[in-house]
């Protein structure tokens, strides 16, 4: 796992087309914004796991590694 430190307003790039921006921090919560092409699915982990369970499949990656 790559661990990065970012401040509010700073962005990181994933590949050429996906950006993740830190929008705010309050206590132990971090608000992030994700910009990605429509063909790239972006889900919170618990939603992704629910989608996979409804499909009857298990995720190929370990939780948190997708």
Swiss-Prot record:
This is Translational regulator CsrA. Keywords: Activator, Cytoplasm, Repressor, RNA-binding, Translation regulation. Homodimer; the beta-strands of each monomer intercalate to form a hydrophobic core, while the alpha-helices form wings that extend away from the core. The keyword Isomerase does not apply. GO terms for biological process: mRNA catabolic process; negative regulation of translational initiation; positive regulation of translational initiation; regulation of carbohydrate metabolic process. The keyword Lipid metabolism does not apply. GO terms for cellular component: cytosol. InterPro entries: CsrA, CsrA_sf. A key translational regulator that binds mRNA to regulate translation initiation and/or mRNA stability. Mediates global changes in gene expression, shifting from rapid growth to stress survival by linking envelope stress, the stringent response and the catabolite repression systems. Usually binds in the 5'-UTR; binding at or near the Shine-Dalgarno sequence prevents ribosome-binding, repressing translation, binding elsewhere in the 5'-UTR can activate translation and/or stabilize the mRNA. Its function is antagonized by small RNA(s). It is found in: Cytoplasm. GO terms for molecular function: mRNA 5'-UTR binding. It comes from Aliivibrio salmonicida (strain LFI1238). Belongs to the CsrA/RsmA family.
